[in-house]
């Protein structure tokens, strides 16, 4: 087991335990607001473009967000089930955003020029998710940068920044990150 995988297993177990009380509130809220199903599965592309089913809490009905869904999406709580994807080895805690096949086709991210982006597992959080790039091309460059420069310290920093985004807000954290670049 690699260091990254050990970190992912420990982190996803901890995440599932920490968020269990939250899920005890979220699941009944989704049921009351809009009924079943609770979980939403969607086919995404993982490492080496292998498809997998990503898990999320369902937040939409007929293309519109539900009342509870708006809150879950705004807080990122709809992504808690992805700890199961991490535990099963389909995702990592940190990595590029998992994309759908239609996203990849729409963005034109196919062919050997884009292979480095797919050399790592997709993540619950990542460099592009935190930086919030201005364009898909910039997002791709951030994904490639992560894939090439990965190290345990980078993952730790990105996880810390993800927590900061959730506590302080994305705009404040992005200003702080931008000041580090200067």
Regions found by a protein language model. Name each.
Residues 31-32, 74, 86, 133:
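Conserved catalytic core of Hanks-type protein kinase domains
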């Amino acid at each position: 087991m690699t260091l990254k995988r050990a970190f992912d297993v420990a982190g996803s177990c901890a995440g599932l335990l920490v968020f269990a009380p939250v899920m005890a509130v979220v699941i009944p809220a989704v049921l009351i607001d809009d009924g079943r199903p609770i979980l939403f599965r969607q086919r995404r592309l993982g490492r080496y473009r292998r498809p997998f089913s990503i898990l999320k809490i369902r937040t939409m009905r007929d293309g519109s967000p539900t009342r509870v869904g708006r809150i879950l999406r705004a807080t990122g709580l709809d992504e808690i089930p992805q700890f199961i994807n991490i535990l099963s080895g389909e995702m990592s805690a940190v990595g590029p955003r998992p994309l759908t096949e239609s996203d990849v086709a729409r963005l034109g991210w196919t062919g050997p020029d884009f292979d480095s982006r797919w050399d790592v597992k997709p993540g619950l959080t990542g460099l592009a998710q935190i930086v919030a790039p201005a364009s898909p091309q910039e997002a791709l460059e951030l994904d490639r940068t992560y894939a090439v420069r990965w190290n345990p310290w980078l993952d730790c920093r990105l996880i810390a920044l993800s927590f900061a985004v959730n506590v302080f807000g994305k705009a404040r954290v992005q200003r702080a990150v931008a000041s580090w670049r200067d």
